[in-house]
């Protein structure tokens, strides 16, 4: 089937839109513009949008289970954010020895832990890493030597973590144990040049992986073995991430970036797609 694509009407374009996350308790899709920098949101019932500027790059936002506030990934590190009080409380910086790095993308596993990647802001050093933030607000470095650590997602049963190094055009798979240990790092998929660079990912209810293609103007659906099932072209070159949203989890939202392609009318837009499949329920941070 052909995907129905809608461009969400709003007053701004994102310079680097990323990290869409559905928060059903609020009826909102949240995402970030890392380079504005700003937090964005869309009310799915009213189609109204909102924004909250930040004084430093913000890489992602994740709700906390049973609470009204969020965890966010800033250039300065992990922090708690209360939207209503408009207050940020720092947790800590997982990379104090890498002042040019910033947190880039994150997801929550079935145990309520956040898995967050980092990257070198000028993208000239292989100093990115993969960190795990536990519900007790302590963190641990789990893997390293990434150019641009990006797009974590999980298998349907939660036993495999998928994580990419965009700079290397490679998506890796890890075995994820119940205690949060990673083993068996392996290449899941290497992008050919025509595919651009792998960016954000999400998993659907069938266990298939949806992945954004930076530089190639599309998203793709892959089976759990990494075989291409479907590719959907979008009217923007730099596609950054995707997430299922809505009460039925049947609306796929896709972020994009206008950086470097400002001449493209739809670059930096938020797209909504009807792709005929549903997503997995979103997870909140357990701490």
Predicted features and spans:
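A short loop-to-beta-strand structural motif that recurs across blades of beta-propeller domains
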Residues: 38-40, 77-79, 128-131, 170-172, ...
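A short beta-strand motif characteristic of beta-propeller blades
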Residues: 4-10, 47-53, 89-96, 137-144, ...
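Short loop/turn segments immediately following beta-strands, especially the blade-tip
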Residues: 174-181, 274-280
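Loop/turn-rich, solvent-exposed surfaces of beta-rich toroidal or solenoidal domains
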Residues: 169-170, 174, 190-227
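Hydrophobic alpha-helical segments and helix pairs
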Residues: 86-142
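Conserved beta-strand positions in repeat-built beta-propeller and related beta-rich domains
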Residues: 23-24, 29-35, 71-76, 114-124, ...
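Blade-level signature of beta-propeller repeat domains, shared across WD40, Kelch, NHL, RCC1
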Residues: 243-287
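Beta-rich, blade/repeat-based domains predominating
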Residues: 11-26, 55-73, 97-113, 143-160, ...
């Amino acid at each position: 089937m052909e995907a129905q694509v809608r461009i969400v009407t709003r007053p701004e374009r994102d310079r680097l839109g990323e990290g869409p996350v559905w928060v059903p308790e609020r009826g909102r899709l949240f995402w970030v513009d890392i380079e504005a920098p700003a937090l964005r949101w869309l009310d799915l019932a009213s189609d109204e949008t909102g924004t909250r500027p930040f004084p430093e790059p913000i890489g992602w936002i994740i709700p906390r289970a049973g609470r009204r506030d969020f965890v966010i990934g800033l250039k300065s590190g992990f922090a708690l954010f209360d939207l209503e009080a408009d207050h940020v409380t720092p947790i800590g910086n997982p990379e104090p020895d890498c002042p040019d790095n910033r947190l880039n993308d994150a997801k929550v596993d079935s145990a309520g832990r956040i898995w967050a990647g980092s990257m070198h802001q000028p993208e000239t050093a292989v100093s990115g890493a993969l960190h795990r933030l536990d519900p007790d607000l302590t963190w641990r470095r789990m893997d390293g030597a990434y150019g641009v650590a990006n797009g974590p997602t999980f298998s349907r049963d939660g036993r495999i973590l998928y994580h990419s190094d965009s700079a290397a055009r490679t998506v890796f798979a890890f075995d994820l144990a119940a205690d949060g240990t990673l083993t068996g790092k392996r290449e899941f998929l290497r992008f050919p040049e025509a595919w651009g660079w792998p960016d954000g990912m999400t998993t659907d209810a069938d266990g298939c992986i949806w992945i954004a293609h930076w530089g190639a103007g599309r998203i793709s659906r892959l089976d759990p073995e990494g075989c291409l099932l479907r590719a959907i072209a979008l009217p923007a070159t730099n596609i950054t991430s995707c997430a299922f949203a809505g009460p039925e989890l049947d609306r796929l939202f896709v972020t994009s970036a206008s950086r470097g392609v400002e001449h493209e009318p739809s670059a930096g837009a938020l797209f909504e797609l009807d792709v005929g499949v549903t997503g997995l329920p979103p997870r909140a941070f357990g701490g």
